[in-house]
Amino acid sequence: MFTLAARRLAIRLPRVRFGSSSAYDEALATIRNDLKLNFRFKADVLEKNVIRSILAETKNLEIDNKDKDLDEFKLYDLLSKMIKQRQDSAAIYLKEGSPDRFRQTGWNELREVDYITKYLEALPVASAEEIEAKVEPIVQSVLEEEGELKSPKEIFSRIPWKVVNQDWQASEGAVKNTVLRLYNLYKTDA
C-alpha cells in the first residue's frame, strides 16, 4: 500500500528552462537533433563524441547556474572554452618529436575543434571582428588621453558592461579576450 502511494506522489514533471533564452534553446535543440541524426545514420564516431561532450558540458552549466538565466552568450563562452582546451591539447600532442599515436590524437583534437566551431558560428552573437570594431575606438581614446596603456583596467573601466549583451550582441568573455588581445598589441607597439 505504501509503495502505491509513493508511486502516485512521485510524478515526474518535464523540466522546463524558464530562465533560458530562445536562442539557447534552439541551439541545444539543434545539437540534440544532430546527435539523433548521427545515431540514425551511423555517421562519424568522433562527431558523436563531440556532441555528447557538448551536451554534458551544457548540462553541467545548467546545474551550476540553476538559479540564473542561461542565454546564447553563456553557451558561446562554454563552446569557446571547449575549443581553447582542444587547441591547447592538440598543440601538446603535435609538438615535434611526438610518437605517431600522439600525433593522431592531436589531429583528432583539431577535428573536434572543427565540429565545435560549427555550433559556435551558428549562435546569434557578434563575431570577433565586430567586437574588435567596438573595442578599438575605446582603446584609441585611452591612448589619446593617457598616451600609453599601463594596464588593461584602463580599457575595462570604459567598456559599457551593462549593454554588452543587448547592444553589442557579445558575451562578456569574448569582450574580455578582445580587450586583452588589443592591450597586448598596443602595449608592445608603445
From Swiss-Prot:
Transit peptide as recorded in UniProt: 1-26
A cellular component annotation (GO) from this entry: mitochondrion
GO MF annotations in UniProt: carbon-nitrogen ligase activity, with glutamine as amido-N-donor
Subcellular location: Mitochondrion
Keywords: Mitochondrion, Transit peptide
Keyword rRNA processing tagged: no
Top-level taxon of origin: Eukaryota
Family as reported in the entry's similarity comment: Belongs to the AIM41 family.
Protein name (database record): Altered inheritance of mitochondria protein 41, mitochondrial
Organism name: Komagataella phaffii (strain GS115 / ATCC 20864) (Yeast)
